[in-house]
Amino acid sequence: MRTRKEVLEYGLSLPDTYQDAPFHDPNWILVRVKKNKKAFLWTYERNGQLCINIKVDPEWRDFWRNAYEAVQPGYHQNKNHWNTVILDGTIPKHDIQRMIAESYDLVI
């Protein structure tokens, strides 16, 4: 996954989700769960790179950060519960999808 469109399409394919732009800034697009309005996927560009923030179980947080250099502590979020993933092509699509799905599972 290397485009915002791909990431958003995957996030929106999960049950009962919707897209939101709460900051009235087109750079920040979120995907939320309808029933509780909790965000599980944030998309934005930073330093010329497309990034996503995803909620992470603290037990898996360091696994993902150690597995991929492009997975870092969550930008502008709680570093214990969120990771930032730089979509630079170094992480296989199935792992990005897994991280997004796990984030979804944590907020439903």
Features from the language model and the residues they span:
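Charge-dense, helix-prone N-terminal extensions
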Residues: 1-108
